[in-house]
Structure formats: structure tokens, C-alpha cells
């Protein structure tokens, strides 16, 4: 839904907003993340941990770099405070894809808030947010050949947070500051072009990827 999309300066601001507001406004006192997240997430959760406003736990990884879903459930089951789970959809270095539906269902089962850094996959991977139990996702235009300096934060319509950036009523009072109009238009056009070729591009990228994996 358009009302769930808010424009930001990029993925870093979007993830900072989601994580900080989940702690500040949604009562999350425990953050579960992984040791291989983007710095936009790891540095944000470390900052909140240092401020002593949220405890941070790191889910185990399997030998192939995938998140250990069983360990994630153990952490969720053992938590005695409201939890924020922050796990990236696609790793920007090793390319692993998180089973975002499985993680979302676990979060739903244990009443946790779920944020996924989807900067690497918006524009490259199909999303059905109506049927994906996630509270926050992020995107950045330059990841699909759009302009730098513009991104989005998706906030599920059932989530109520206060602004992270103050000083104006832009973005429906959610994010202060004059909008980057040219960046937003460029974001929309680049996303339109990326989604129009998504299946073709996925097939093209997948062919050399799996060839390399087989040969190695």
C-alpha cells in the first residue's frame, strides 16, 4: 500500500530508523541479529547496546553462511522481553538468501518485531508484502541503477512509530526534511525498469552463478 512507503536518504537511514524506533516506540528491549549484517544494522544495534537500552544476541550461522533457523527459534523462545529480529534478506558479500517467510512466521509466533534489510533484493527479487509477515523492509535506488542518495522504508500499516528525523512535516509527518524530488522520481523509474526485466535478469545472473559454483 502506498501509505506504507516512506522515502529516505537511503538504506542506512531506513535501517537506523526501523531499529531505533522499534526499541524506542515499540518496546523492543532485546535485538536478535546475525554477525554478518551490513554495518547499517550492526553499528546501529551496537550503539543501542552501548546505550544500555537494548540487549543484543547473535543468531548462529550454518557452515554455508545461512542463518540457523533452529537457533533463531531457541533465542526467541528464551527471550523474556519483547524482541526485534533484524536479518538481511540477501547478504551483500556471499549472496545467501534468507527465508524471509520462515523468519517472519517465527517472529509472528513469538510476538517479535521483524526488520529485514532488503537493500540488495528490492528491484531484483519479487516481494508480496501482503503475504509476508514483516514489519519493516528497506530499499536503496542505487542498487538497481537508480540515483544515489534516495531510499525507502516500508512500515507495515499495523505498526505505529514516531519520527526518527525531526523538523518538518514531510513524508506524512514521518520523516522531516525537504524530499529529494529528483531522486524519488529516479527511484520510481529505475524500479519500474528493473521489475519489467526481473525474470530475464534473474535467469541471466543465475546461469553464470551456478556454473561458477559447480566448477568451484
For the regions a language model picked out, list residue spans one by one.
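Pyridoxal 5′-phosphate
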Residues: 1-216
Amino acid at each position: 500500500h502506498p501509505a506504507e512507503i516512506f522515502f529516505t536518504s537511503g538504506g542506512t537511514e531506513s535501517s537506523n530508523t526501523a531499529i531505533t524506533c522499534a526499541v524506542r516506540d515499540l518496546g523492543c528491549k532485546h535485538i536478535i541479529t546475525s554477525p554478518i549484517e551490513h554495518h547499517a544494522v550492526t553499528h546501529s544495534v551496537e550503539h543501542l547496546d552501548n546505550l544500555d537500552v537494548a540487549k543484543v544476541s547473535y543468531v548462529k550461522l550454518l557452515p554455508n553462511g545461512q542463518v540457523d533457523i533452529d537457533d533463531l527459534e531457541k533465542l526467541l523462545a528464551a527471550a523474556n522481553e519483547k524482541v526485534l529480529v533484524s536479518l538481511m534478506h540477501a547478504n551483500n558479500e556471499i549472496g545467501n538468501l534468507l527465508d524471509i517467510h520462515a523468519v517472519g512466521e517465527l517472529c509472528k509466533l513469538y510476538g517479535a518485531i521483524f526488520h529485514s534489510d532488503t537493500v540488495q533484493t528490492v528491484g531484483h527479487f519479487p516481494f508480496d508484502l501482503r503475504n509476508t509477515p514483516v514489519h519493516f523492509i528497506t530499499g536503496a535506488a542505487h542498487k538497481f541503477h537508480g540515483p544515489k542518495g534516495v531510499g525507502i522504508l516500508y512500515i507495515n500499516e499495523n505498526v505505529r512509530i514516531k519520527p526518527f528525523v525531526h523538523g518538518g512535516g514531510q513524508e506524512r509527518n514521518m520523516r522531516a526534511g525537504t524530499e529529494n524530488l529528483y531522486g524519488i522520481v529516479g527511484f520510481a523509474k529505475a524500479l519500474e525498469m528493473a521489475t519489467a526485466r526481473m525474470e530475464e535478469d534473474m535467469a541471466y545472473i543465475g546461469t553464470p552463478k551456478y556454473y561458477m559454483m559447480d566448477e568451484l
